[in-house]
Amino acid sequence: MSSENKEQHNLSPRDLPEEAYGFPPELPLGAQRGSSTDLRQFEPSDRRRAFRRIHMELHEKPDTNIRQLVMRKLQKSCQCNATKIRNRIFDFFPVLRWLPKYDLKKNILGDMMSGLIVGILLVPQSIAYSLLAGQEPIYGLYTSFFASIIYFLFGTSRHISVGIFGILCLMIGEVVDRELHKACPDIDTTSSSIAMFSNGCVVVNHTLDGLCDKSCYAIKIGSTVTFMAGVYQVAMGFFQVGFVSVYLSDALLSGFVTGASFTILTSQAKYLLGLSLPRSNGVGSVITTWIHIFRNIHKTNICDLITSLLCLLVLVPTKELNEYFKSKLPAPIPTELIVVVAATLASHFGKLNENYNSSIAGQIPTGFMPPQAPDWSLIPNVAVDAIAISIIGFAITVSLSEMFAKKHGYTVKANQEMYAIGFCNIIPSFFHCITTSAALAKTLVKESTGCQTQLSAIVTSLVLLLVLLLIAPLFYSLQKCVLGVITIVNLRGALLKFRDLPKMWRLSRMDTVIWFVTMLSSALLSTEIGLLVGVCFSMFCVILRTQMPKISLLGLEEESEIFESISTYKNLRSKSGIKVFRFIAPLYYINKECFKSALYKKTLNPVLVKAAWKKAAKRKLKEETVTFHGDPDEVSMQLSHDPLELHTVVIDCSAIQFLDTAGIHTLKEVRRDYEAIGIQVLLAQCNPSVRDSLAKGEYCKKEEENLLFYSLSEAVAFAEESQKEKGVCVVNGLSLSGD
């Protein structure tokens, strides 16, 4: 507890002697009660005063008629001319602005190199992440291909890489598994829409006059979720509600990604061991999965285990070398592609699937499947799941685009980014794709290899197109354990966030707690619940910060007019009889009692002083033989009008962002309590919003507007001048009247 809390004016009627409340004999019994300051004697025209008041004239506010405002907005929006149409089209398709101005000599080499490298990295990652989403490998390649082209058309960031993303694939996979489980166990063999065959559950689609097996139904679910996520993102862009992302702080997003990374690692562990286990969903899926793994550990496929260990021994050190020598290497070593090629050749020629029952990727078709609309009947089942997926997708995309734009000195439009990522989901959902977003790891690679514009995304899509048309079938023998290793190794960045915790703790303990809560809930409960818990806990922390604000008494620096906290800085002095109080938070219904109790504790409690005066006066009445007429309480207060050393309380409102009704009532109550014992209350450095609230709340009358000041120095000077005008001086801590 600071020394400020031990104020000599914190009075109590029980622990202070009666003599402390004695009144000087010359004090008239009929002293006039009321406001402690006669404001009429301090009119601005009074030339006798040394004090000079600052006056600032407000701009006239325009008429805020809602109907007229809406009509003006509509007229402005509905105006149509050639220039406006052109600007709207160019804003919606940013590529039309920058592509005609493209500097071929300056940018083409960097764009081609970065696009080629990112495309090479995306091939194995797209195949691996498709398994995470419960899809066939070809759908991961489709997703990255279409996302690259569409972001090229709609995006405003020059550097981010948009494509398949592990966290979103995990969330898609959980929805896919849940819907498959709902469709297959509860089979009605008499139904015309679902039938059970010996090889599993098959869904009949009458509109296509054909059968839809597990793989077909899984991509229907995935594409429907993707479509809904894109619709939400475009809607948020249209209604300009990008502010939602501000509730996803850096600490929350980092904790969520790290927690989800544990879930991803857990889901891929079975591939590393070659175990065939059902996927666990719902609350506690991580714990349930590990229980299943340890129960079946004796069924480990030795071939898959050895392959996984060899891949880890190659990938992990190479990733570290790429990171260590990134400033010296012209491009990162494409270790993942090398491992995929080597593992595929070893599996093919070693016949690992036939000889050791090693699980492989299987047939990957070439070319493109015919476009197909999402399954509209699934929308009610997945609409809620798509909300969390859409928010995470656009939050990561917008934050990365703004981060790299700031780094390279250009601007991005957040709402256009939401349109871009939304269309990266809506359009590909008709081409058997799953949800996409920007990814930090690939964006860093793209930037470090010389990317200048989004033309590099076209180069990336050409690499993926080559794989889709020619190379994809060659991955038939690729072991799934290799894909699992690639997925786990790419979690390295998220898992290494633990190294940043000591620094985060030193910077902000609250952010560290938010990180831990979000991470643990995402890992131990589920990704959706973890995100919800993180957002709710962050909001609670914001409220907690306003409910427990920083408070301090201010002192004056000797050689300036700067007021700062006495408990923080040395060599500050307080003006005699004046207390300057600072409250660093908005004043509203949640913290009104905190404000009041802190103010009374730091300065003087007027309620206790008034009670002590009454108590002392009643005892004094019993001893006096004088006959008083009138109300006993009135007489008590007249008798006990004890002069105090403190005559003014100045409240520094510079850190009070806003007031609500409860806050205004609290200020009125505080002022009334202090003026009842002869102490004036002044407000200084109120922002225009606070001044407007005080005026609307009738905090002071028209003639009392002098109680509001633009600076602390002005308020303190006014307080000193008012005491001089009253003819009151302070001697040995007692105020003596000059009357």
Swiss-Prot record:
- Tell me the function of this protein: Sulfate transporter which mediates sulfate uptake into chondrocytes in order to maintain adequate sulfation of proteoglycans which is needed for cartilage development. Mediates electroneutral anion exchange of sulfate ions for oxalate ions, sulfate and oxalate ions for chloride and/or hydroxyl ions and chloride ions for bromide, iodide and nitrate ions.
Which intervals hold domain STAS? 568-719
Location in the cell: Cell membrane; Apical cell membrane
Q: Which species is the source of this protein?
A: Rattus norvegicus (Rat)
Q: Name one GO cellular component term.
A: apical plasma membrane
- Catalyzed chemical reaction(s): oxalate(in) + sulfate(out) = oxalate(out) + sulfate(in); sulfate(out) + 2 chloride(in) = sulfate(in) + 2 chloride(out); oxalate(out) + 2 chloride(in) = oxalate(in) + 2 chloride(out); bromide(in) + chloride(out) = bromide(out) + chloride(in)
Record region (Disordered): 1-44
- State whether keyword Repeat applies: no
What is the protein's given name?
Answer: Sulfate transporter
Q: Does the record carry Nucleus as a key word?
A: no
| Glycosylated residues in this chain | N205, N357
Q: Supply the alphabetized keyword list.
A: Cell membrane, Glycoprotein, Membrane, Phosphoprotein, Transmembrane, Transmembrane helix, Transport
Report the superkingdom from the record: Eukaryota
Q: In which tissues is it expressed?
A: Cartilage and intestine. Expressed in the kidney (at protein level).
Q: How is it modified after translation?
A: N-glycosylated.
> Might you name a Gene Ontology BP term for this protein?
chloride transmembrane transport
Pfam families recorded: STAS (PF01740), Sulfate_transp (PF00916)
Q: Which residues cross the membrane?
A: 112-132, 137-157, 227-247, 255-275, 378-398, 420-440, 455-475, 524-544
- Tell me the residues on which Phosphoserine occurs: S12
Record-level Gene Ontology MF annotations: bicarbonate transmembrane transporter activity; chloride transmembrane transporter activity; oxalate transmembrane transporter activity; secondary active sulfate transmembrane transporter activity; solute:inorganic anion antiporter activity; sulfate transmembrane transporter activity
Q: Topology in the membrane?
A: Multi-pass membrane protein
